[in-house]
């Protein structure tokens, strides 16, 4: 019986130790190893196929700020804005001209985005709505020349009247024309001023313009970006080092940007936003390089979350204040002069796009309150305007996300151009976009069955082993207690003999004491008087 109790004790203790080590140490390492072998950009893997051509469209929303009092604003009044949208598009992403470098463990490719108008999701909007915005070319050109080439102002002013006859500070046109189909740019004039201005169109410096013939171009905000090359990336495949999966190492065949006056701001940090490495630490954030704004942005951990019953973590993004971080002073016009830094929650895009544009979260959410107060019609709030992503860390899977960004004109009066002489100086919102994704059950089930069922199995197994081990330990303790409680308490013979001897001595002592007391009583005078009285 003693042997069985010891076997039960050893088995239960060993089971408890095994459950703890296997459940919290061994199994997670095995699972991470299996994921690291599956989640790579090596040709022939499922992840490579999904990454190369997204098998489902992302949702792309455009919200436009319609200026309802353009004539008043041209005379210096406060702008009144009306948000119109969303205009909804299906965004398809794919990569082409892929070249692998096995030695460097990288893959180079060109990114392509294709936007298809979704009439049903956009309804009742059709895309033919008339929108009033600051003139898409006159205002940016006038402001840029005033800031950077003031000596050419007279020449450019004349050129604008030739290329855009009868143009005013604000332009009214159809949404689809402004954003995709294009506005006509007439470079047919033989005047020197017009030819000087049109040079930037012929040389391709205006990337949003498409040449239609020898003398005409079409300019639009997004037309040239639709189904066209968005730039060549080189990223890590993650075969040799899984933690480098998707990391951007080159863009446009360059190892860093040259848009900003400091090395820190020109570095690539993170991925191209279409893939993330597994096993990230939540405090490290999610970083991605965005060519449209020439900058890497990081979303930071906010809280725990869930998606379709699966645990996740939520990250959100804040452009912050470049003044408060010395490493970000290179995003100022002059890193040595903080007065040249953009307002809190914004980013100056001029060094990136060549025009007076400001990026921020929609409605200036989390930006300097003065920006919101400068115009009418804004209502910043977290639900509609925050950037967020619900992310599964172990597999590196984004469950759902909303990437939102607003583009505004850094407007100011331009003395040399008559229609712009009385404009107010402020940052005027133009439009904002949202790129959203919500994984459907087809893809969430892939994560669920390959990851979470394994985690649930591990959880069930380890707790079953631990519970059975604890029951075994308690049973062993009870058996040992029962054995101890049933033992007979028997004195050794020597102790019994000595105890009897002591008892005899005590009894003999008592007898002698009684005899002595009796003799003393008998010898006392009058001891028998009571007997005589009883006789009478």
UniProtKB/Swiss-Prot annotation:
Location, primary (coarse class): membrane
Keyword Repeat carried by entry: no
Region (Disordered): 507-536
Topological domain spans for side Extracellular: 29-459
Subcellular location: Cell membrane
Pfam annotation, one family: CD36
GO biological process: cell surface receptor signaling pathway; cellular response to pheromone; detection of chemical stimulus involved in sensory perception of smell; lipid homeostasis; pupariation
Polar residues bias (residue ranges): 514-529
Disulfide-bond pairs as recorded: 265-330, 294-352, 332-341
Keywords linked to the UniProt accession: Cell membrane, Disulfide bond, Glycoprotein, Membrane, Olfaction, Receptor, Sensory transduction, Transmembrane, Transmembrane helix
Membrane topology: Multi-pass membrane protein
One GO MF term attached to the UniProt entry: scavenger receptor activity
Superkingdom in the source lineage: Eukaryota
Protein family according to the UniProt entry: Belongs to the CD36 family.
Function of the protein: Plays an olfactory role that is not restricted to pheromone sensitivity.
Protein name, as recorded: Sensory neuron membrane protein 1
